[in-house]
Regions:
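Beta-strand-rich ligand-recognition modules
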Residues: 96-152
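Intrinsic-disorder/low-complexity, polar/charged segments enriched in Ser/Thr/Lys/Arg/Asp/Glu/Gln
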Residues: 67-73, 84-86, 132-134
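Glycine-centered loop/turn motifs
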Residues: 57, 65, 128-132
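An acidic-aromatic loop/edge-strand motif
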Residues: 2-33, 135-164
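Catalytic-loop region of hydrolases
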Residues: 36-59
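Short beta-strands within extracellular/lumenal beta-sheet-rich domains
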Residues: 60-78
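A structural detector for beta-sheet-dominated domains
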Residues: 47, 55-57, 77, 88-90, ...
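Aromatic-lined ligand-binding clefts that engage carbohydrates, nucleic acids, or primary amines
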Residues: 81-99
Length: 164
């Protein structure tokens, strides 16, 4: 507890917190997924069968030499115009995140207890209504959670689309 009789000190503390408060949230409930193999930089071989559609809460499987690509499109709604935008993503393992084709960062899952957890990607700010974000995650098995499973003999592991 802060022990100060000065009201302006508390008011200043509140002002410092306000920019970090989430005021609006836009859930991305459905993602397209396709699987394949990363061969070399910008060279991929995709599995036959096309894309699958996954929703938050669904599980997906990956293993050695497998790469999964998740994609979704978001259009900034009017009520988010002028605000700071962030993506909060937790798909299970680790993933490289591209926005409109450009690498913006990487995320790693909270489900891998003991390993680094990163789930925030900063977008261009301030947001402008109508702006389109094409989001793509390139997820592979190089995550700590899979290493633990592989050491125990697993060839594949299941992850969950937790947050988007």
């Amino acid at each position: 507890m802060i022990k100060t009789p000065k009201l302006n000190v508390i008011e200043n503390l509140v002002k410092q917190v306000n920019p970090y408060v989430i005021t609006d949230e836009l859930i991305i409930p459905v993602w397209r997924k396709r699987d394949g193999v990363h061969i070399a930089p910008n060279e991929y071989s995709f599995n036959p069968g096309g894309e699958a559609e996954l929703s938050l809460g669904d599980t997906w499987e990956t293993g050695y030499d497998m790469t999964s690509w998740f994609s979704a499109k978001v259009i900034v709604p009017e009520e988010m115009d002028g605000k700071k935008l962030y993506l909060r993503l937790d798909f299970g393992g680790e993933a490289l995140v591209r926005i409109n084709g450009a690498i913006k960062g990487a995320v790693s899952s909270r489900m891998n207890s003991g390993w680094v957890h990163r789930d925030i990607i900063h977008l261009d700010n301030p947001a402008r209504k109508g702006t389109v974000y094409n989001i793509e995650l390139e997820a592979t098995v190089n995550s700590g959670g899979f290493c633990d499973a592989a050491m125990a003999g697993a060839k594949t592991v299941f992850y969950t689309l937790n947050t988007a």
